[in-house]
């Protein structure tokens, strides 16, 4: 008998019910009780969705972020929040976003830092530690969910983040060693496991994904210490790893005193033989055999071919699951009513992935003949995709093969370009700009919806969008910004917008996944070779530039970010797909330049998140990623200024690669880290211009003029003032005009003060 289970289920709801409830609560439209009821309804639905599994995860639901949930379970709440009055949920949202529902300005606090969850597009709230951090157990949330789940009749498996990964994910605020806290933390984990065991829980999934990263001796010792301390727990521990291979941590993972080990068999299939040999015979081995991070059907027959000898050896010690939490997958393919039927047949979302796990387990336990129809249907779909002429475009392949090194080079060095751009643009010191998008009002979203549904003709839609663009331009002129943007009213998403206009893409209606908090994204699906049939942005940017004498930025998403924020075909190397995207963006850049656009921004917000988790593999990734950007950006004259933007990035370890992109201006997200990201520039003299973000757009809080000046002065300690720009952290799409106007006015006023300081000096 094979045990089937799941590491986690998407929490947002098939139609984003959680998102809408969160935002209604924050705006005071619904009560806390109503928000909690939505959460309870979603949990019940999701447990029913997983009822075919032998073990159902509990504790994977969150009102914002699972790492923040763990922080509250362990009593790790920043003092700036814990001193405020209010209930636990209010303080929870204050850490997450700087304020809770209907907080007045006096209750606003600095939101917790947010960064990427390993190499995914999910973001977590970074735990904050000091040498004096104390831990205290608060299991109420988890216990309440266990009580709910028991009522469904499911056999439950609580899910928690392991103690060593939790410390690894956090940040020391006083330069103390995070691992010094481990001995203080472990008794709280032991108490939590005892509480869970007393609830009748047999298995607890304890996630230690750092085991797929490069660990030094100190962190390996910490893992040994942690699990030898926790081994007396009455509950059995399933140690879960995901997102990669164990490699040099394989022996350690096998030897830790736990009841079982889950591994990512999508990325780590080559290690399974060694795992079978090394894992003690009293432990279970859970294999993640269905890809939890992509949307392609599993080739079930091929998977069974290699799984059969594994099952023959392990028998009931073999467990099957997706490779990682299905948090990274859309919920239900059956919701897709408008997708091309052939392409839809190639896909599997979260619910379908659980079906695949069950089919595999049944085929192994009871024989393939018991699921012959399901296996035949799966084989037909896999074969259809493999042989479809829609996937392959010979002209695109020829264009990629014709790429030369010269296509990635600018005509002159940065100093020459900078002089020519300064002469052409005539910008002041500390030039102000924004990152691209402006608030997406209800009117904008309604117009796009009506256009998609055929209620608006092309000319009617164009008129409405031009009105929004003009409004955005006038707002920026009134605020006094130096370099303007058109506001992106016509764009639903910075990746999906481009994908809709590229051949080789298909789109879902409800393929939403959580990015952070209430922010959901609907990644487009790359199913075939990529090409650009026609210009994608030129009409809108030309119109915006016609409204003003100030420079108007052309706004594009870069090839690496489009790749990393899409569901990508898995039948060819990612690098090859990225080069196809680079050629499409290059053609758009050249069209914008021909249209008279003087500044072109090519966002590479997701450059860093594509890095492999192991540093040994970075060089190969950065080589083709930087090369792709340069191919996209560098077919222009010296006088054309190329910008790029990056989000949530630590730069110390890839600063040379970023410099190698050779963008004239780079804007980065730094406000939540209080400019700490600029530490990268202490030992590396970045040669070009840079705009460190001074306005945290992920929080509704409005930065003061004084605060912005202080941040920019910190930046000027590292970057020469004549190479600094003043800008928000990221696009303003998710904010409203009532927040944006005063924030940008303070930013413009701060820039004026900085210029006056330079003149006075």
Swiss-Prot record:
E.C. no: 2.1.1.14
Cofactors that this protein relies on: Zn(2+)
Residues given in the record as 5-methyltetrahydropteroyltri-L-glutamate binding sites: 16-19, 116, 519-520, 565, 609
The protein's annotated pathway: Amino-acid biosynthesis; L-methionine biosynthesis via de novo pathway; L-methionine from L-homocysteine (MetE route): step 1/1
Signal peptide from the UniProt entry: none
Sites where the protein binds L-homocysteine: 435-437, 488, 603
Note on cofactor: Binds 1 zinc ion per subunit.
Domain of life: Bacteria
Binding, Zn(2+): 645, 647, 669, 730
Record's catalysed reaction(s): 5-methyltetrahydropteroyltri-L-glutamate + L-homocysteine = tetrahydropteroyltri-L-glutamate + L-methionine
Active site location: 698
Gene Ontology MF term list: 5-methyltetrahydropteroyltriglutamate-homocysteine S-methyltransferase activity; zinc ion binding
Gene Ontology biological process terms from the UniProt entry: methionine biosynthetic process; methylation
Annotated keywords: Amino-acid biosynthesis, Metal-binding, Methionine biosynthesis, Methyltransferase, Repeat, Transferase, Zinc
Function of the molecule: Catalyzes the transfer of a methyl group from 5-methyltetrahydrofolate to homocysteine resulting in methionine formation.
Listed name of the protein: 5-methyltetrahydropteroyltriglutamate--homocysteine methyltransferase
Species whose genome carries this gene: Hahella chejuensis (strain KCTC 2396)
């Amino acid at each position: 008998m094979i045990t089937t289970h799941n590491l986690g289920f998407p929490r947002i709801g098939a139609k984003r019910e959680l998102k809408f409830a969160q935002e209604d609560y924050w705006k005071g439209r619904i009560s806390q009780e109503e928000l909690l009821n939505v959460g309870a309804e979603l949990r019940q639905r999701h447990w029913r969705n997983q009822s075919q599994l032998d073990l159902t995860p509990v504790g994977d639901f969150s009102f914002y972020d699972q790492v923040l949930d763990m922080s509250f379970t362990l009593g790790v709440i920043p003092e700036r929040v814990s001193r405020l009055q209010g209930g636990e949920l209010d303080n929870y949202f204050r850490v997450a976003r700087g304020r809770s529902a209907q907080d007045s300005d006096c209750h606003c606090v600095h939101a917790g830092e947010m960064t990427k969850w390993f190499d995914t597009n999910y973001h977590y709230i970074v735990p904050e530690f000091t040498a004096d951090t104390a831990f205290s157990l608060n299991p109420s949330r988890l216990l309440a969910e266990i009580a709910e789940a028991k009522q469904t009749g499911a056999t439950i498996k609580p899910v928690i983040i392991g103690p060593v990964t939790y410390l690894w994910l956090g940040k020391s605020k006083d330069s103390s060693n995070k691992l010094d806290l481990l001995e203080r933390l472990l008794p709280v984990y032991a108490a939590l496991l005892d509480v869970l065991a007393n609830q009748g829980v047999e298995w607890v999934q304890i996630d230690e994904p750092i085991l797929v990263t490069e660990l030094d001796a100190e962190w390996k010792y910490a893992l040994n210490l942690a699990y030898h301390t926790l081994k007396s727990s009455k509950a059995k521990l399933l140690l879960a790893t995901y997102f990669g291979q164990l490699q040099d941590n394989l022996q350690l993972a096998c030897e830790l005193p736990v009841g079982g080990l889950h591994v990512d068999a999508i990325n780590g299939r080559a290690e399974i033989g060694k795992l079978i040999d090394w894992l003690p015979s009293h432990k279970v081995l859970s294999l993640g055999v269905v890809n939890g991070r992509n949307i392609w059907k599993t080739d079930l027959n091929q998977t069974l071919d290699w799984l059969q000898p594994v099952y023959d050896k392990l028998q009931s010690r073999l467990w099957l699951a997706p490779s990682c939490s299905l948090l990274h997958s859309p919920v239900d393919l059956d919701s897709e009513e408008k997708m091309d039927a052939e392409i839809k047949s190639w896909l599997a979302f979260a619910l379908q992935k659980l079906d695949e796990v069950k089919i595999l387990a049944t085929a192994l336990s009871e024989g393939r003949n018991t699921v012959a129809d399901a296996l035949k249907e799966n084989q037909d779909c896999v074969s259809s995709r493999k042989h479809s002429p829609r996937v392959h475009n010979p002209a695109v392949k020829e264009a990629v093969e014709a790429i030369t090194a010269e296509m990635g080079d600018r005509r002159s060095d940065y100093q020459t370009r900078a002089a020519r751009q300064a002469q052409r643009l005539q910008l002041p010191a500390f030039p102000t700009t924004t990152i691209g998008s402006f608030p997406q009002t209800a009117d904008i979203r309604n117009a796009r919806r009506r256009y998609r549904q055929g209620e608006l003709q092309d000319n009617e839609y164009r008129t409405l969008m031009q009105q929004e663009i003009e409004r955005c331009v006038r707002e920026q002129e009134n605020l006094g910004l130096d370099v303007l943007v058109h506001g992106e009213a016509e764009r639903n998403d910075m990746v999906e917008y481009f994908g809709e206009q590229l051949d080789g893409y298909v789109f879902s209606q409800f393929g939403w996944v959580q990015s952070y908090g209430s922010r959901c994204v609907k990644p487009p699906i790359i199913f075939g070779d990529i090409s650009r049939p026609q210009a994608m942005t030129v009409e809108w940017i030309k119109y915006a530039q016609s409204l003003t004498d100030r420079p108007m930025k052309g706004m594009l998403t870069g090839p690496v970010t489009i790749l990393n924020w899409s569901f990508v075909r898995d039948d060819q190397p990612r690098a090859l797909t990225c080069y196809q995207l680079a050629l499409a963006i290059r053609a758009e850049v050249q069209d914008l330049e021909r249209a008279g656009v003087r500044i072109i921004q090519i966002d590479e917000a997701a450059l860093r998140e594509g890095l492999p988790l192991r540093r040994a593999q970075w060089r190969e990734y950065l080589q083709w990623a930087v090369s792709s950007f340069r191919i996209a950006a560098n077919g222009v004259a010296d006088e054309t200024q190329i910008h790029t933007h990056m989000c949530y990035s630590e730069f110390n370890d890839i600063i040379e690669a970023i410099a190698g992109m050779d963008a004239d201006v780079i804007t980065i997200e730094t406000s939540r880290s209080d400019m700490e990201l600029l530490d990268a520039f202490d030992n590396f003299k970045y040669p070009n211009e840079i705009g460190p973000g001074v306005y945290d757009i992920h929080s509704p809080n409005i930065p003061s003029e004084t605060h912005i000046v202080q941040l920019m002065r910190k930046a000027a300690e590292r970057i020469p003032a004549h190479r600094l720009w003043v800008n928000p952290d990221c696009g303003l799409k998710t904010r409203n005009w009532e927040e944006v106007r005063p924030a940008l006015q303070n930013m413009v006023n701060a820039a004026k003060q900085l210029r006056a300081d330079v003149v006075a000096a």
